[in-house]
């Protein structure tokens, strides 16, 4: 059975999340936030503890029907639907990550992942995916976060980790906080520079992708640089 610890000092999971971040919360607290309220017999933390104690693992959530979830947790249909929707969303996120690590990458796959990761950032972030000879990700590395004095990174910073990982190829991604994905003249110059630097070391630059929260631009798909 799933092991649960009930701690009276953790009675405010939402406040703890705001102070410490979601990763600091227990499964019990995270579930309590989703449940929002308890039922007639149990406080919300007691209810989440009770529900988790009847599972062998968190994966059991996905196997449960709406009716089973309602019956076990003593919650209404709306709350059960919300929990099932969250579980399905998490499953889809994990499916994207698995696709990226297990199979050949396409610009669309990378763009979808990075639109979710970088689309809401207020500063420019430059991320590089380092790949092996089967196009599997060796490392995903944030190389640079923009400042008012500087945007994008130098090729040597990108290539340092390529050599460290013994990568065969790489994909460069950065976001445009403005939401406009059209590449600037600096983006073109940077792409030419990193592509040339990669070629000098025998590394393949597969693509440079610009993302916003809802769209992307692939230099491989839309420019003549590749």
UniProtKB/Swiss-Prot annotation:
Q: Cite the MPN domain residue spans from the record.
A: 103-225
Q: Does the keyword Zinc apply?
A: yes
Q: Which GO terms describe its molecular function?
A: metal ion binding; metallopeptidase activity
Q: Which residues bind Zn(2+)?
A: 174, 176, 187
Q: Which SUPFAM superfamilies match?
A: RuvA domain 2-like
Motif: JAMM motif; annotated at: 174-187
* CDD domains membership: MPN_DUF2466 (cd08071)
Among Pfam families, the record links this protein to: RadC, UPF0758_N
Q: Which InterPro entries match?
A: MPN, RadC_JAB, RuvA_2-like, UPF0758, UPF0758_CS, UPF0758_N
Entry keyword S-adenosyl-L-methionine:
no
An annotated GO BP:
proteolysis
Keywords of this protein's UniProt record, alphabetized?
Answer: Hydrolase, Metal-binding, Metalloprotease, Protease, Zinc
Among NCBIfam families, the record links this protein to:
PRK00024.1, radc
Question: What family name appears in the similarity comment?
Answer: Belongs to the UPF0758 family.
Q: What is this protein called?
A: UPF0758 protein M6_Spy0838
Q: Which organism is it from?
A: Streptococcus pyogenes serotype M6 (strain ATCC BAA-946 / MGAS10394)
């Amino acid at each position: 059975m799933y092991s649960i610890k009930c701690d009276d000092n953790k009675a405010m999971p939402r406040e703890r999340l705001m102070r410490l971040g979601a990763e600091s919360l227990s499964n019990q607290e995270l579930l309590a936030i989703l449940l929002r309220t308890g039922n007639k017999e149990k406080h919300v933390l007691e209810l989440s503890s009770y529900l988790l104690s009847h599972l062998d693992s968190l994966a059991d959530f996905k196997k449960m029907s709406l009716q089973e979830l309602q019956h076990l947790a003593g919650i209404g249909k709306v709350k059960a639907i919300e929990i099932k929707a969250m579980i399905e969303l998490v499953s889809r996120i994990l499916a994207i990550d698995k696709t990226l690590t297990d199979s050949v990458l396409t610009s669309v796959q990378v763009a979808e992942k990075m639109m979710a990761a970088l689309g809401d950032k207020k500063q420019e972030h430059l991320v590089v995916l380092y790949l092996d000879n089967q196009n599997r990700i060796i490392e995903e590395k944030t190389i640079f976060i923009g400042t008012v004095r500087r945007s994008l990174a130098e090729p040597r910073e990108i290539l340092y980790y390529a050599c460290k990982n013994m990568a065969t190829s790489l994909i460069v991604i950065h976001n445009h906080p403005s939401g406009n994905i059209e590449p600037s003249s600096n983006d073109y110059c940077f792409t030419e520079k990193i592509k040339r630097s990669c070629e000098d070391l025998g590394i393949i630059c597969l693509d440079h992708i610009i993302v916003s929260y809802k769209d992307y631009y692939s230099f491989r798909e839309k420019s003549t640089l590749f």
